[in-house]
Structure formats: C-alpha cells, structure tokens
Regions:
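A metal-dependent, Asp-based hydrolase signature
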Residues: 46-79, 89, 96-97, 105
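Substrate-recognition "cap/lid" segment bordering the active-site pocket of phosphatases
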Residues: 83-86, 113-164, 169-178, 192-194
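Glycine-rich phosphate-binding loop signature in dinucleotide/nucleotide-binding domains
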Residues: 1, 100-104, 155-161, 217
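Structural motif
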Residues: 101, 178-180, 198
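Short, acidic loop-to-helix structural element flanking the phosphoryl-transfer center
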Residues: 2, 79-108, 114-121, 145
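Active-site neighborhood of HAD-like aspartate-dependent phosphohydrolases
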Residues: 1-44, 60
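Short, glycine/polar-rich helix-capping loops at beta-to-alpha or helix-loop-helix junctions
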Residues: 187-197
Length: 217
C-alpha cells in the first residue's frame, strides 16, 4: 500500500456545500454593512479560514466590522440558511470502502471551524470514518502546511506516505510545500487549469475516478 494516510478537504471535495457558503457570506456582508459580494469572489476564498477569507474579500475592513461579519456568517450558516448540504454522490460509499479495507488511515484538513466540522460529523454520522482532523481555527489556515504537519505527527506518518485530496489550489499548495503527493478534484470551486499549476499526481473529474485511484494505492 503506497499511502498510509489519505487527507481530505471537506467543502467542495467531499460535501456539496459551496452554494450555502456563498449565500451565507453574501448575507453576512450585507448584515455587516459591507455591501454585496460577488458570488465568484466568495467561491474563490472557500478553503481559507474565516478570518483570512474575510480579509481577502473585504480589504481594509476594521476589526469591529470584521467580527460582526464573522458572527453573522456563523449565524446564517447554522440557523439562518436552509440551502441543502449533502455529500457528493458516491462519496459516502467511497469513504466507507477505504475505511473498511484497513491498513490506511483517513483524515480531514479543512477551512471549517472545529465547531462546524464536529457538527457535520454528528449530523452525517461521518466522523467514524476519520482517524484525525484539523480545522482552520485551531492551527494555521491553508495554504500554510501546518495543519498537514500536525496530522502527520499525530498519526506517525511521513509526508511521502500521505496524499492530500482537494478542490482548491490552497489544498494542493499546502501539500506541495512539504513534499506530499496531492490529488485534485474538479467538481469543486477552482478551475482545472488552476489546479494543474500545483502539479497534482492525479486529477479526478468524477467521484468514482477518485476512489478507484485511491483504492489502487
């Protein structure tokens, strides 16, 4: 088995949550008095930690308004928005297959908060598939590789024994920074040509392609 550890991004890679993130960020921006944010700009920052995302979307924003925007985003995401979020078709079966074959550990590295990821784990009963996880509010945000470095130390795996799977250049670049293989998926937020610049070992254009490739490794 080539990879002892497979690390997945969450939003846009495993879960179809992009529309909800965009809606909630746009609503939060209006609530905070910053005005309307273009959907494509919001899509572009998905994967970053929330403070980093706000700083990118709202250059020059003061700390008080940034905190208001952050709190309104959290409210909209948890309580104020009912845009459906579900796993992409085939993801649950693919994760279960990797988990059940044994000998390989699974982890999550996400721009979500710990509270948000744990809530999704509970609601979807998906936490049982993963041996470890890191969120952007408990370590450095992507594209800094610290969350990957911490996962490797926790699970006792070398970078050359692991692979990162994601839909953004932030995912791929943090893996590239520490010499870790990376797999790009094209059903998320960043365009294939943008992902290709990070030189992924494989690019999956459909969920079955991703898990078939991982099963062979």
């Amino acid at each position: 088995m080539r990879y002892r550890l497979v690390i997945f991004d969450w939003d846009g890679t495993l879960m179809d949550s992009v529309a909800r993130i965009v809606d909630c960020m746009q609503a939060a921006s209006r609530d905070a008095g910053w005005g309307e944010l273009e959907a494509e700009r919001v899509r572009n920052i998905i994967g970053l930690g929330l403070p980093e995302a706000i700083a990118s979307l709202c250059p020059g924003i003061d700390s008080v308004r940034a905190e208001l925007l952050r709190s309104r985003y959290a409210w909209h995401f948890v309580e104020g928005n009912d845009t459906p979020m579900r796993f992409f078709a085939g993801v649950e079966e693919g994760l279960a297959g990797l988990h059940d074959r044994g000998g390989q550990r699974l982890a999550v590295a996400t721009g979500k908060s710990r509270r948000g990821l744990d809530r999704i784990f509970r609601e979807s009963d998906s936490g049982r598939w993963f041996h470890a996880s890191r969120t952007a509010d408990e370590t450095r945000s992507k594209p800094h590789p610290r969350m990957l470095e911490e996962l490797l130390v926790e699970l006792g795996v070398a970078p050359q024994e692991a692979v990162m799977v994601g839909d953004t250049e932030y995912d791929l670049e943090m893996a590239r920074a520490i010499g870790m293989d990376r797999v790009a998926v094209t059903w998320g937020v960043h365009a294939p040509e943008r992902l290709a610049a990070s030189r992924p070992a494989f690019t999956a254009e459909a969920v079955p392609e991703l898990f078939n490739w991982l099963q062979g490794r």
